[in-house]
From Swiss-Prot:
Expressed in roots, leaves, stems and inflorescences. Gene3D superfamilies: Nucleoside Triphosphate Pyrophosphohydrolase. SUPFAM superfamilies: Nudix. Disruption phenotype: No visible phenotype under normal growth conditions. Residues 51-72, 129-152 are annotated as: Disordered. This is Nudix hydrolase 15, mitochondrial. Its EC number is 3.6.1.-. Residues 1-23 form a transit peptide. A motif (Nudix box) lies at residues 140-161. Its cofactor is Mg(2+); Mn(2+). The modification N-acetylmethionine is found at residue 24.
Length: 285
């Protein structure tokens, strides 16, 4: 039996979900909630499940030598082409790639209908690059960040006012590599008490804060894909259309790829569609 919450407070001056879908529950085993800092017993069990997840090994790069492009100058992680680093086509010349490191926060909470939901943002329409696109809170690592979890939660606090003390960081997924060679670490965190989170979007970066059901990224509904080519290799880029209230959002590229993987790990099943064309060459390990 799941605990019932009050309706999620309106994401102040932003968009929040009102249409919730009944979803298949993740395959989790009931465990003690003593190690989880608040929330329902189901979220505590989910936290225990995700803490046991170990990402597969990925290619190793020397982080001391970094490649930077104009795309990463702003330090933000937004929707763009991206792959799990372990399947990116780098075997042709792996020594060439020295990516910068970044982290994004996949912040999960339990919706009013018991479904798992993830917090997303829409970038400000005033930004010069990728304006109006959907992204996960996140950005580049700073020298004082002790780990990827700190990077992700620090950026979330800066962008949407999410107090890090409300988030229980439970695991990190394997790195993703953006089109412009930014190594992105997805960090999964669980929002302990959604009623304590009152989003305060940074007006210089964020236009809206909203949430979506995590399971939608495993379904072949409101989704389309497009074949493209990168570095001589073909791949699929995914687009998810999502409507909440009177707002329509499109979640695509790197953000969609990360959420597909996060949903697969959380629900312990693959998506109901082909993720990408099986033509990638694996990097040397």
């Amino acid at each position: 039996m799941f605990l019932l919450y009050r309706r999620l407070p309106s994401f102040a001056r932003t968009t929040t979900t009102t249409l919730l879908c009944k979803s298949m529950e993740p395959a989790i085993t009931a465990t003690s909630s003593s190690s989880f800092g608040g929330g329902s017993s189901r979220l505590a069990a989910l936290a225990q499940q995700l803490r046991q997840y170990k990402p597969p090994p990925s290619s190793s790069f020397d982080d001391s030598e970094e490649m930077q492009t104009d795309q990463e100058t702003a330090g933000k992680v937004v929707s763009q082409v991206g792959f799990q680093e372990s399947i990116a086509p780098l075997s042709k010349d792996p020594d060439r790639f020295k990516p910068k490191r970044a982290a994004v926060l996949i912040c999960l909470f339990e919706g009013d209908d018991g479904d798992l939901r993830v917090i997303l943002t829409k970038r400000s329409s005033k930004l010069s690059t990728h304006s109006g696109e959907v992204s996960l809170p996140g950005g580049k690592a700073e020298e004082d960040d002790k780990d990827d979890g700190m990077t992700a939660t620090r950026e979330a606090e800066e962008e949407i006012g999410l107090d890090p003390s409300l988030v229980d960081v439970v695991t990190s997924l394997e790195p993703f590599l953006s089109k412009h060679l930014l190594r992105v670490i997805p960090v999964i965190g669980i929002l302990r008490d959604k009623n304590k989170f009152n989003p305060i979007p940074n007006p210089g970066e964020v236009e809206a804060v909203f949430d979506a059901p995590l399971e939608m990224f495993l379904k072949d509904e409101n989704r389309r894909s497009e074949e493209r080519e990168w570095m001589g290799e073909k791949y699929l880029i995914h687009y998810f259309d999502y409507r909440t209230g009177d707002k329509d959002y499109m979640i695509w590229g790197l953000t969609a790829g990360i959420l597909i993987r996060a949903a697969s790990v959380t629900y312990e099943r693959p998506p109901a569609f082909i993720e990408q064309c099986p033509k990638f060459k694996y990097p040397k390990m």
